[in-house]
Swiss-Prot record:
It comes from the Eukaryota. It is a multi-pass membrane protein. The lineage of its organism: Eukaryota, Fungi, Dikarya, Ascomycota, Saccharomycotina. It is found in: Membrane. Keywords: Membrane, Transmembrane, Transmembrane helix. It comes from Saccharomyces cerevisiae (strain ATCC 204508 / S288c) (Baker's yeast). This is Putative uncharacterized protein YJR023C. Partially overlaps LSM8. One of its GO terms (cellular component) is membrane.
Length: 133
């Protein structure tokens, strides 16, 4: 049980770090939007990749959490409360996967700054394709 709590604390710290990085990148994006449009396209590309990577990491940790939850539920005597936790974790994992797909398909690849940045950096397309294949 202590390992699950440590895992949850580690997960929260990691997500907080990712949110801080996203906020910093957003502030840089706003700064360069005002002063330098070429750098703005590169910052937007980095922002989009970091956003997608953070969803991938969240999905990965959610799947590990679902496995830990189902494993800890199987180690305890069967109770009415232990089964919904496992189902909740699996539903959360499914929700994160749907959200990642939505972000990939609708928000990021359709944005004009992301497409402009892709022209300057074709390796970005390869990285995002490998990450989210």
């Amino acid at each position: 049980m202590i390992y699950i709590l440590l895992y949850m604390v580690l997960l929260l710290l990691l997500l907080l770090l990712l949110l801080l990085l996203l906020l910093l990148l957003l502030l840089l994006q706003l700064y360069y939007f005002v002063f330098d449009s070429y750098t703005f396209s590169h910052i937007t590309c980095s922002f989009s990749i970091l956003f997608l990577v953070s969803f991938s990491i969240g999905t990965f940790f959610s799947s590990i959490g679902a496995r830990l939850s189902s494993f800890s539920a199987s180690m305890r005597p069967t109770r009415a409360i232990s089964l919904p936790r496992s189902n909740c974790a699996l539903q959360m994992n499914s929700l994160l996967m749907r959200l990642k797909t939505l972000v990939m398909n609708r928000l990021v690849f359709l944005s004009k700054p992301f497409r402009l940045a892709m022209r300057h950096s074709p390796s970005t397309l390869i990285i995002t394709t490998l990450l989210f294949k």
